[in-house]
Amino acid sequence: MATLHIEHPITDLSTWLGAFSRFSEARKSAGVNAERIQQPIDDPNYIVVQLDFDEAAAATAFKQFLETNVWSSPQASPGLAGSPRARVLESVTAR
């Protein structure tokens, strides 16, 4: 399993959630099988998203889609304030 971990400042939660919802089909088509949205308890203008994929390649491809088609356009990413930080993570096992 791989997780696309994304975090960034937002203008407000309602606007951001509306934009996030518009891309639900894109997430499904890309192979997202679970998602988590969280905020720091002390910062309502910051969001953390984790999207789970079966394969790292699918997570990497979706990261590239977001960078090229979503985050590069203010019209496609209302609610985004600042630059997102995104990384593809894989689970490790303690020995």
Residue ranges of each PLM-predicted region?
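Short structural boundary motif marking the start of a folded domain
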Residues: 1-4
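Short hydrophobic/aromatic beta-strand micro-patches
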Residues: 7-9, 50-52
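Short, surface-exposed ligand-recognition loops at beta-strand->loop->(often short) alpha-helix junctions
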Residues: 9-19
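Residues that cap or initiate secondary-structure elements
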Residues: 12-14, 55-57, 92
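An amphipathic, aromatic/His-enriched active-site/gating alpha helix that lines ligand/cofactor pockets
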Residues: 17-36, 52-86
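Residues that line or immediately flank small-molecule/substrate-binding pockets and catalytic motifs
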Residues: 39
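Short acidic/glycine-enriched loop/turn segments that link adjacent beta-strands
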Residues: 42-45
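Short, low-order "capping/linker" segments at domain edges
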Residues: 87-95
